[in-house]
């Protein structure tokens, strides 16, 4: 059973992993970010969201901004030291460690996410597809979520609601846009985190993920 969710917001940043210093966003929301929004609305160990299609409702627009970030991170060695009972500084001084970085972000983003969910082996005997479908429907109608959905960064919150129409008019009808390699998701299955990519093609304003080939 599929569901359609409308998401929109002022800014978004789906940062390309190959550009580590200056932040540069992908042209549209990534499948993993879309799944993260759905998880923020309804997450349960007995189900897993699968994004089928992403409809782009607003033209792709960019904005250059500068953001305050910290230039270091807490090391795993310091964490282990504190866990073993020894004293060590386990914090970052944001005032002393602050730096500004440029970022190319998206603005005025507006999508419709078409998705379904698969049941997992962690589902209990009382769990069923109809149960989860009804739970998602109620949460969309009431605007409920487990935590605030966001577009790539928590500074860019995503508003959401159920898509009430039978058709979707995109910003790019009768147009095909090659978006290049895009992050699909992260594979956590074999003890190490492996990024997965796919060749993103925006056809008639729709990013179709149903039969895309994934590269590791």
Residue ranges and their predicted role:
Residues 7-11, 58, 113-121:
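Beta-strand elements of well-folded, non-transmembrane domains
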Residues 69, 79-216:
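Internal, well-folded beta-alpha domain core
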Residues 1-21:
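N-terminal, Lys/Arg- and Ser/Thr-rich interaction peptides
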Residues 19, 24-69:
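Glycine/small-residue-rich interface belts in oligomeric ring/scaffold proteins
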Residues 13-15, 62, 121-123:
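Residue-level signal for secondary-structure boundary sites
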Residues 1-3, 45-47, 52, 107-113:
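Structural beta-strand/beta-sheet cores of well-ordered domains, especially the beta-sheet scaffolds
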Residues 9-11, 55-56, 70-73:
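A short glycine/small-residue-enriched secondary-structure motif
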């Amino acid at each position: 059973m599929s569901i359609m969710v409308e998401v929109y917001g002022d800014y978004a940043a789906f940062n390309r992993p190959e550009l580590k210093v200056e932040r540069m966003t992908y042209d549209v929301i990534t499948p993993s970010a879309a799944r993260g929004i759905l998880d923020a609305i309804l997450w349960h160990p007995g189900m897993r969201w699968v994004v089928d299609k992403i409809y782009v409702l607003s033209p792709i627009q960019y904005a250059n901004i500068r953001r305050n970030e910290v230039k270091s991170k807490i090391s795993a060695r310091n964490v282990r030291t504190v866990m073993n009972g020894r004293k060590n500084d386990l914090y970052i001084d944001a005032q002393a460690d602050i730096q500004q970085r440029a970022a190319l972000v998206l603005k005025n983003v507006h999508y419709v996410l078409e998705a379904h969910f698969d049941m997992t082996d962690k589902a209990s005997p009382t769990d069923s597809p109809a149960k989860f479908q009804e739970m998602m429907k109620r949460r969309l109608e009431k605007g409920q979520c487990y935590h605030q959905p966001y577009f790539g960064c928590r500074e860019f919150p995503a508003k959401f609601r159920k898509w009430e129409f039978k058709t979707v008019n995109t910003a790019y009808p009768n147009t095909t846009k090659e978006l290049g390699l895009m992050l699909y998701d992260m594979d956590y299955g074999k003890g190490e985190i492996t990024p997965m990519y796919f060749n993103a093609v925006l056809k008639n304003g729709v990013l179709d993920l149903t039969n895309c080939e994934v590269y590791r």
